[in-house]
Amino acid sequence: MAIGLIGRKVGMTRIFTEDGVSIPVTVIEVAGNRVTQVKTLETDGYRALQVTTGTKKANRITKPEAGHFAKSGVEAGRGLWEVRLEDGEGEGIEVGAELNVDIFADVAKVDVTGQSKGKGFQGGVKRWNFRTQDMTHGNSLSHRSNGSIGQNQTPGRVFKGKKMSGHMGAERVTTQNLVVVRVDVERNLLLVRGAVPGATNGDLIIKPAVKA
């Protein structure tokens, strides 16, 4: 069985192979994911697991959250996440069960979803990798400006979705096909090759790679 789990980005480091090759890895802490609800085709129209992880102070829990956790008999966590299930997945998992990183023991590659680091308002050069204009040759004001953003009277407007300056980052990003380098069951750690979205301590959704 290989369904998605919720983890926390610990940071990056490197490990060495027996041949002395350095591999950059991201360390993800995948503490116990407690099942708070099992959604079925009959009651919800689709199959999914709702899970929580971590802890949350009692004075930070809203009454609806408290009722939901009490109904499931699960300790309140720092949030609620939902993981879709395909046919045949998650059979036998009940409310209150705890899922751990060992379910990735036989998984070669994973997709990791997180919220990218926010960069604030940025121009086209940084946000979209536009090339800069001439530094000299009569250009004194438009070194990093976008340049032309459209045509003339026809169509007489700027098309929607045009790449321009604006808010960069702080959006949901998925990095696909990250190689699983190591699964540390004792310390609840998952080591994947390369970088994952988001800052240190950010929440991540780890799923088996769909394109592996």
Curated annotation (Swiss-Prot):
Annotated positions of the N5-methylglutamine modification: Q153
Compositionally skewed regions (Polar residues) per UniProt: 136-155
Pfam families found in the cross-reference section: Ribosomal_L3
Start and end residues of each stretch annotated as Disordered: 136-157
Keywords from the UniProt entry: Methylation, Ribonucleoprotein, Ribosomal protein, RNA-binding, rRNA-binding
InterPro entries linked to this entry: Ribosomal_uL3 (IPR000597), Ribosomal_uL3_bac/org-type (IPR019927), Ribosomal_uL3_CS (IPR019926), Transl_B-barrel_sf (IPR009000)
PROSITE patterns: RIBOSOMAL_L3
A GO cellular-component term linked to this record: cytosolic large ribosomal subunit
Modification after translation: Methylated by PrmB.
Molecular function per GO: rRNA binding; structural constituent of ribosome
GO biological process, one term: translation
Family: Belongs to the universal ribosomal protein uL3 family.
Role noted for this protein: One of the primary rRNA binding proteins, it binds directly near the 3'-end of the 23S rRNA, where it nucleates assembly of the 50S subunit.
Record's subunit section: Part of the 50S ribosomal subunit. Forms a cluster with proteins L14 and L19.
Record HAMAP family: Ribosomal_uL3_B
Name of this chain's protein: Large ribosomal subunit protein uL3
Species this protein is from: Shewanella sp. (strain W3-18-1)
Gene it is expressed from: rplC
